[in-house]
Regions:
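Aromatic-lined, polymer-binding surfaces characteristic
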Residues: 101, 105-295, 306
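Covalent nucleotidyltransferase core used to form phosphodiester bonds in nucleic acids
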Residues: 413-418, 443-458
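Conserved small/polar residues in nucleotide/adenosyl-binding loops
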Residues: 468-474
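Structured loops at beta-to-helix junctions and adjacent beta-edge loops in soluble globular domains
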Residues: 70, 82-85, 100, 206, ...
């Protein structure tokens, strides 16, 4: 940790202390009043997020997929649920709330999925598309329940800045759909706008930096940038774009492989850039050329690492993370990301548009744009793809039945290598989309630490192991 990072962390502690003095002894509703005076004049413009309000290809699911397969219907208003146990997260001040290795409660990552509020945007979309008040009433009930039970900086939903950022993004899309709908209570829209501005104001003061700056920072910057576009706030727009530009080559190798060396986290970051690019294009805002060049390389890498655009061969962690979901239920995340990036780049990749188009994509692009992708000749995938700098090679059998992936990469990004595994020279193999030799992945993040560590160890991967060497370093 260098001197600049130490100074930043000290400044963050000072800021947190000021917030504790202001908010710890009160239950401030995030939607009741603005906490930051400089954002009081901002107004929301629903047309600047790039939604296709003419879309007629939609479903009306109201459930979201929860990490671990938990039943959303049981938990949909259980905002403080521990999930892995019957216990609840405390509603104490978030800076004083420990959430890692709390095995007596559960894995915070599971709870965060519920509090990202994909269901808010989903219900608002359903109401806009059908005018059926049952979706509006359910959205109101969830919104009122959440704001009452989750005052600002109280409880598990406020323990991660990135989680606040994802929630703010989903509130923006929620407000966009409601702004185009009839019979919407004006106070509801005002509360959403106030809540979004408060959350973005908070994120803009606390976004990740230095050794903490990984995929979290990309999502936080995207939230700030999208809010800058949607609220006509030049300060937020400029900040978001500048962070995303600076981080692009810090967090990715020049051949398109993300330095976290986790395919899913690469796609998570790609979604952030793609959503931001799409909104910038909608607003006639100049997109840095390096963004498009790198996103093209990253999309090519993901295409090479998948079987017929349907099944991903994943090395490293996979927590099923996403930023926006207007379809609901359990989605094919690979198809969604590849379709989204193909349309942003105006370049179809092999197999991608042979699959059903994800509904989120239908709400972001017109039928004509999607049709153009279907008619264009897709980019082929080579039978041998080697990403020397990023450290992965993929081999195919010529008939696209067999896919082999070989990991000859570093172990992860930065000093903590948070989402990479000790998987040097490991390989995977699938045939007809079925895994024959698989990476173990990991199923847990913030609890049961011995198992978290076990599934990241070398001996859990398809590679050679020197047990004498391992024992010497344990």
């Amino acid at each position: 940790m260098n001197a600049k990072e130490i100074l930043w962390r000290l400044e963050q502690k000072k800021s947190q202390h000021r917030e504790k003095v202001r908010f710890a002894n009160s239950d401030m509703d995030i939607t009741s009043s603005l906490f930051y005076e400089e954002i009081s004049h901002l107004s929301f413009d629903a047309g600047r997020l790039g939604l296709n309000f003419k879309n007629k290809k939609f479903g009306v699911r109201t459930d979201i997929h929860l990490l671990g397969g938990y039943d959303y219907g049981i938990y949909k208003q259980d905002w403080h649920a521990g999930f892995q146990t019957g216990n609840k997260w405390s509603r104490k001040f978030s800076y004083s709330l420990p959430y890692k290795q709390c095995d007596h409660i559960g894995d915070a990552r599971t709870n965060w999925e519920l509090n990202r509020h994909f269901q808010f945007a989903l219900l608002a979309k359903n109401f806009y598309a059908t005018s059926d008040l049952k979706y509006y009433r359910e959205l109101q009930a969830l919104f009122d329940s959440w704001r009452r039970e989750n005052p600002f900086l109280k409880g598990i939903s406020w323990t991660s800045v990135m989680e606040v950022a994802i929630r703010a993004i989903n509130w923006m899309y929620t407000l966009a759909f409601l702004s185009q709908s009839k019979n919407v209570d004006k106070d509801f829209k005002i509360r959403l706008s106030v809540g979004i501005r408060n959350m973005i104001g908070y994120v803009s003061q606390h976004y990740s930096r230095f050794s903490s700056a990984n995929n979290h920072l990309l999502v936080e910057a995207t939230a700030i940038g999208l809010a800058g576009l949607a609220f006509h706030c030049e300060k937020w727009k400029t900040l978001g774009i500048s962070i995303l530009t600076e981080e692009l080559l810090k967090q990715n190798y020049t051949d398109g492989v993300n330095k976290e060396l986790s395919l899913h986290y690469q796609m998570f970051g790609m979604e952030a850039y793609a959503l931001m690019i799409h909104s910038m294009q909608t607003c006639n805002c100049n997109v840095p050329e390096i963004w498009l060049q790198m996103l093209e390389k990253m999309t090519e890498y993901v295409g090479c690492s998948s079987w017929r655009g349907n099944v991903a061969m994943e090395f490293g962690d996979d927590d099923e993370g996403k930023i926006l979901d207007l379809q609901g239920g359990e989605i094919n995340h690979l198809q969604y990301i590849m379709q989204l990036c193909s349309l942003v780049l105006k370049t179809p990749y092999q197999y991608i548009f042979q699959h059903p188009v994800n509904e989120t994509v239908c709400w972001l692009f017109t039928d004509e744009e999607i049709g153009d992708m279907r008619r264009m000749e897709p980019l082929p995938i080579s039978d041998a793809c080697c990403f020397k700098e990023g450290g992965n090679t993929f081999l195919r059998d010529g008939q696209d039945r067999v896919l082999i992936g070989i990991d000859h990469a570093a172990l992860g990004f930065g000093s903590i290598a948070a989402h990479g595994h000790a998987d040097a020279l490991s390989f995977q193999m699938m045939m007809d989309g079925k895994m024959l030799f698989a990476d173990p992945g990991t199923y847990i993040y913030h609890c049961d630490l011995p198992f978290r560590n076990l599934f990241r160890k070398t001996e859990m991967h398809n590679t050679s192991v020197s047990y004498t060497h391992l024992r010497a370093h344990e």
